[in-house]
């Protein structure tokens, strides 16, 4: 019998958007063009055209003891070449940003190999070999996962995800890494992800707009689609909460099942 992944519960558009993000067979809509050179500038790990720094020789040149797991798992290109590990970190506004931290974590783990990801309330970091990171970052920035106004590339001083948007719909950024170009109607980055000034601004394109964000967001909100309106999602969350509360704190809830498992009838 074949198994089809369900990814996440829910019957609303929010749940469907989450499933699209996680489903590797779903192709993200490309919404903007960011050159490789501009992306490297915003990441701030190396200069455009600079070689990748390495932390060990290419795997083909190294001697290893026999390891069946290593033989079974194909290394990603950066690992093959010994390239160092680097990161990109996003902050997502709670005002209907396309993605949010837990959605990002699940999406990264379903879609990409060789990743390490960390989830906090208002930011999400993805770490991997720098060579592979740039390719993944390009997809994350050029597609529907990213909105220049409500998604921020922030390697440090990430605060702002829960603050009100400004008059141009931009999420607050204490380091002012990006500004709104009123002539073009575009968001442009004037600093890299840790706040170092760029020689030239990087154009990230036009903000998506409030109506479009409400359609594609993965965030439940009372003023859009409330989680209370998603019966299946609530049911699953309540089941998990009940099981963790009653079972996790003991209270003899699962004692009969435990005795059976231990063979003590």
Curated annotation (Swiss-Prot):
Return the Gene3D superfamilies for the record. Answer: Methyl-coenzyme M reductase, gamma subunit
Pfam families assigned to the protein according to its UniProt record, in alphabetical order? MCR_gamma (PF02240)
Q: Which reaction does it catalyse?
A: coenzyme B + methyl-coenzyme M = methane + coenzyme M-coenzyme B heterodisulfide
EC number assigned by the record: 2.8.4.1
Q: How is the cofactor bound?
A: Binds 2 coenzyme F430 non-covalently per MCR complex. Coenzyme F430 is a yellow nickel porphinoid.
Q: Which cofactor does it need?
A: coenzyme F430
- Family, per the entry? Belongs to the methyl-coenzyme M reductase gamma subunit family.
Protein name, per record? Methyl-coenzyme M reductase II subunit gamma
The protein's organism comes out as Methanothermobacter marburgensis (strain ATCC BAA-927 / DSM 2133 / JCM 14651 / NBRC 100331 / OCM 82 / Marburg)
What are the top taxonomic ranks of the organism? Archaea, Methanobacteriati, Methanobacteriota, Methanomada group, Methanobacteria
């Amino acid at each position: 019998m074949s198994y089809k992944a369900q990814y996440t519960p829910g019957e609303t558009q929010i749940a469907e958007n989450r499933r699209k993000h996680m489903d590797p067979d779903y192709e993200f809509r490309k919404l903007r063009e960011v050159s490789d050179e501009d992306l490297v500038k915003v990441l701030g790990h190396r200069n455009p055209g600079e070689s990748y720094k390495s932390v060990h020789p290419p795997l083909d040149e190294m001697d290893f003891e026999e390891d069946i797991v290593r033989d079974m798992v194909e290394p990603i290109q950066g690992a093959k070449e010994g390239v160092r590990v680097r990161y990109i970190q996003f902050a997502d506004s709670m005002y209907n940003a396309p993605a949010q931290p837990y959605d990002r974590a699940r999406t990264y783990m379903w879609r990409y190999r060789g990743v390490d990801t960390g989830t906090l309330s208002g930011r999400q970091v993805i770490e991997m070999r720098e060579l592979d990171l740039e390719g993944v970052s390009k997809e994350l920035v050029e597609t529907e996962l990213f909105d220049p106004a409500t998604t921020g590339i922030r390697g440090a001083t990430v605060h702002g995800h829960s603050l009100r948007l400004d008059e141009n719909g931009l999420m607050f950024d204490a380091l002012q890494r990006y500004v709104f170009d009123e002539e073009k109607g575009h968001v442009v980055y004037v600093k890299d992800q840790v706040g170092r000034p760029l020689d030239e601004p990087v154009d990230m394109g036009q903000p998506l707009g409030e109506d479009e964000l409400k359609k594609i967001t993965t965030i439940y909100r009372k003023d859009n689609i409330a989680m209370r309106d998603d019966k299946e999602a609530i049911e699953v969350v309540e089941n998990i909460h009940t099981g963790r509360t009653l079972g996790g704190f003991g209270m003899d809830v699962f004692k009969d099942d435990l005795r059976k498992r231990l063979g003590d009838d």
